[in-house]
A protein has these predicted regions:
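Catalytic domains that recognize anionic headgroups
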Residues: 1-122
Length: 122
């Protein structure tokens, strides 16, 4: 399986890989896991049928796809122990704001980064 942003199944592949690794470790082992979900990165237009260019709609579709894969990952952690989850992005993305596209620029949208942390209870 591939994990790259051009694979429409990348998040499912990443979660499959992560769950497989978790299940191989003894349940009493402490685990640190970092997953960079590539589906949200461009290109993400392939998450909307017929779309040829990334935009807010395709970005939202990619986010919904990644969100749909998280329950399997969270359940694998719940089978082990209480787990601290930290979810964040490395940068935001412009989709036409002030005439800018994507994230290789200095713009407020690029610096706007979502963050959430929570405890998954066993």
């Amino acid at each position: 399986p591939t994990f790259g942003c051009t694979d429409k199944n990348s998040a499912a592949n990443q979660v499959d890989f992560a769950v497989d690794k978790l299940e191989k470790y003894p349940a009493d082992w402490k685990v640190f896991m970092y997953i960079n979900f590539s589906a949200i990165h461009y290109p993400n237009c392939h998450y909307v049928e017929g779309k040829k260019k990334d935009d807010k709609e395709s970005h939202a579709a990619a986010l919904r796809y990644v969100d749909s894969q998280l329950p399997r990952l969270f359940e694998a952690f719940r089978r082990r122990s209480d787990t601290l989850v930290i979810a964040l992005s490395d940068h935001g993305t412009c989709y036409g704001e002030d005439g800018y596209e994507y994230h290789c620029i200095s713009h407020e949208k690029v610096y706007t980064v979502p963050y959430k942390h929570f405890i998954l209870r066993k």
